[in-house]
Amino acid sequence: MMPQSGVAQPPMAPMSMDQHQYQQQAPPPTQQQQWMMPPQQPQQPQFQPQSQPAWAQQPSQQQYGAMATTNPNPSPTGNPNEVRSLWIGDLQYWMDENYLSTCFYHTGELVSAKVIRNKQTGQSEGYGFLEFRSHAAAETILQTYNGTLMPNVEQNFRMNWASLGAGERRDDSAEHTIFVGDLAADVTDYILQETFKSVYSSVRGAKVVTDRITGRSKGYGFVKFADESEQLRAMTEMNGVLCSTRPMRIGPAANKKPVGTPQKATYQNPQATQGESDPNNTTIFVGGLDPTVAEEHLRQVFSPYGELVHVKIVAGKRCGFVQFGTRASAEQALSSLNGTQLGGQSIRLSWGRSPSSKQTDQTQWGGSGGAYYGYGQGYEAYGYAPPAQDPNMYYGNYPGYANYQQPQQ
């Protein structure tokens, strides 16, 4: 008899029609066999294993609804004050409550699933919450599923406690992250992670940035390390190394500082909204520059992200501009470098003025530059939820952070 406690393992895949017919047509036991066999209780149909378990197959919309109604949610048990909810992120636009229910249906521990949606558009914000029967069940689910492959999609579960209570420990240590560009279309989180983990033991995870609507890779991602020395080694040792079919392009990325590190306030660049909405804009404003940083140093830092058209530091203003050849390159640089340290100062990035703007660009490239002393909010290149709704996880909008300093050459 199977034990009732704990989390159930994923169910076996349904048997084929031929197998089902074979079992139905099997001859009944002889009279002697009937006497020797103990009385049996009604049993659930026995499933035969196959290469892909049933929980890893994409259900249809009808199956989603049927699954949700045929498995009544169990009632919570234990202390009502204990933490029983998990946060789940990196959800694609089509991943709704029914999809999440199918992921954990077989455990018998899921009470409810909720996807957070934009109040104006109704579209998913890319994260949600899962409530389980008990704290113990939620903890087992977290330990079992976090970082493993999600059903029928090439990405891993990204989970954490929805809130921290007694007994939970959060990772307050710093994380050291690198940017990885020029990724082939078939590179997944797992492939990227294993490419680095086979060389560096401190690799904590990897994330390939995907389009929220299509789910397709944008061709770049991030790898995080626990050991800063391995991060710095990877910056040079892995540059040009093949991942799948293409050589990787490695660059610096903003790091997560330990919890408790004071974060700087953010200000809104009045030009950022206009620049972000213009698909032809490839110019990035760079604020907070150390006076010792020269244009050549700025070029070295931004060049790993794509072809540079123009680099300009406004004299005496501690700010500058970097123009890329393509919008995609500018997006990668902005999302990766915002908050990194150059010359001992954390740079602040936002979109510069669009070249198509009818306004004069004298202040942008050679004038006072006064309009650009502010800088925009964290650029949500990944489509993740804001940091306040993402409890101590990595990637996306982690603000501040940055211990990597590009070496002078």
Swiss-Prot record:
Subunit structure: Interacts with the poly(A) tail of mRNA in nucleus.
Keywords in alphabetical order: mRNA processing, Nucleus, Repeat, RNA-binding
Statement: the UniProt record of this protein carries the keyword RNA-binding: yes
GO biological process assignments: mRNA processing
InterPro entries attached to this UniProt entry: Nucleotide-bd_a/b_plait_sf (IPR012677), RBD_domain_sf (IPR035979), RBM42_RBP45_47-like (IPR050825), RRM_dom (IPR000504)
Main function: Heterogeneous nuclear ribonucleoprotein (hnRNP)-protein binding the poly(A) tail of mRNA and probably involved in some steps of pre-mRNA maturation.
Residue ranges occupied by any RRM domain in the UniProt entry: 84-164, 176-255, 282-354
Highest taxon in the source lineage: Eukaryota
Region (Disordered): 1-83, 251-280
Compartments it resides in: Nucleus
SMART domains: RRM (SM00360)
Record GO cellular component, one term: nucleus
Chief location: nucleus
GO MF entry, a single one: poly(A) binding
Biased composition, class Polar residues, residue ranges: 263-280
Gene: RBP45
Tissue: Constitutively expressed in leaves, roots, and stems.
Family statement drawn from the similarity comment of this UniProt entry: Belongs to the polyadenylate-binding RBP45 family.
Protein name: Polyadenylate-binding protein RBP45
Compositionally biased residues, Low complexity: 19-81
